Amino acid sequence: MTTQLTHLQQLEAESIHIIREVVAEFDNPVMLYSIGKDSAVMLHLARKAFYPAPPPFPLLHVDTTWKFRDMIEFRGRMAKESGMELLVHVNEEGVKRGVSPFTHGSALYTDVMKTEGLKQALDRYKFDAAFGGARRDEEKSRAKERIFSFRSANHRWDPKNQRPELWSLYNTRIKPGESIRVFPLSNWTELDIWQYIHLEEIPIVPLYYAAVRPVVERDGMLIMVDDDRLELKPGEKVEHKSVRFRTLGCYPLTGAVESEADTLPEIIQEMLLTRTSERQGRLIDHDQAGSMEKKKQEGYF
């Protein structure tokens, strides 16, 4: 008797196959852990792929020093629970220069603290493959990227030089110094992610659930006041609203949405009615036309 897999089971099986393929083919893989919902699902899949042993690779978090406090607390808890080594890398040169989203703008800040920080970490530990939680439905440049995304020795991505991926066969050959970025969640949608989190009871950062939080309206977005480093501009005032986050990043660059959805079923119901991208709340995606693709070509994930 043939068992018919559900949609989520098919996605799960594909992702686990990809994760195992990387471990079989590469010498020194790593999983980028950004602490968001996609990272939570990816970590869960990795643990399933190698259960009862822990995944045979470490977690890497590129810390910009501007993450939400709830994210940092959650990061430590999940690393301990998974039994995996957690590597945290900070671009100390950027810290010494005082680079921040307020003083240097989102584009330069992202380049220094995220892109350069990531490249430093990959070079330092000599990783030849790095898992990421990006999905094709998030953004147009990610929509055309392969699951196994080739990067040069300078960590650059050339969208015109991508490898064919037919019948779940992946070309993993690289020269010394080159690497591959791997996206096991490429074919998942935001709704798939939420339904899987609900089905598997995967822990996520509390910021995804609606709650009354201090926010300030800035450039058409609701920015949460997470610590005293957020300086108010003339005319701005802190308000307390029921909000949640569809996507998580650095708190000064991540907009909240007004919502009353404080349970997973309510979030899923809200998702069914939403017609905008989750990354609409990420300021770094609006720096310039083709912003994300330019960042990826320079080494961003």
From Swiss-Prot:
Keywords, alphabetical: ATP-binding, Nucleotide-binding, Nucleotidyltransferase, Transferase
Record bears the keyword Nucleotide-binding: yes
Assembly and interaction partners: Heterodimer composed of CysD, the smaller subunit, and CysN.
Family classification: Belongs to the PAPS reductase family. CysD subfamily.
GO molecular function: ATP binding; sulfate adenylyltransferase (ATP) activity
EC number: 2.7.7.4
Protein known as: Sulfate adenylyltransferase subunit 2
Entry's Gene Ontology BP terms: hydrogen sulfide biosynthetic process; sulfate assimilation
Designated gene of the protein: cysD
Summary of the function given for this chain in its UniProt record: With CysN forms the ATP sulfurylase (ATPS) that catalyzes the adenylation of sulfate producing adenosine 5'-phosphosulfate (APS) and diphosphate, the first enzymatic step in sulfur assimilation pathway. APS synthesis involves the formation of a high-energy phosphoric-sulfuric acid anhydride bond driven by GTP hydrolysis by CysN coupled to ATP hydrolysis by CysD.
Functional pathway: Sulfur metabolism; hydrogen sulfide biosynthesis; sulfite from sulfate: step 1/3
Reactions listed under catalytic activity: sulfate + ATP + H(+) = adenosine 5'-phosphosulfate + diphosphate
Transmembrane feature ranges: none
InterPro entries registered for this protein in UniProt: PAPS_reduct_dom, Rossmann-like_a/b/a_fold, SO4_adenylTrfase_ssu, Sulfate_adenylyltrnsfr_sub2
Domain of life (superkingdom): Bacteria
Enzyme category, top tier: transferase
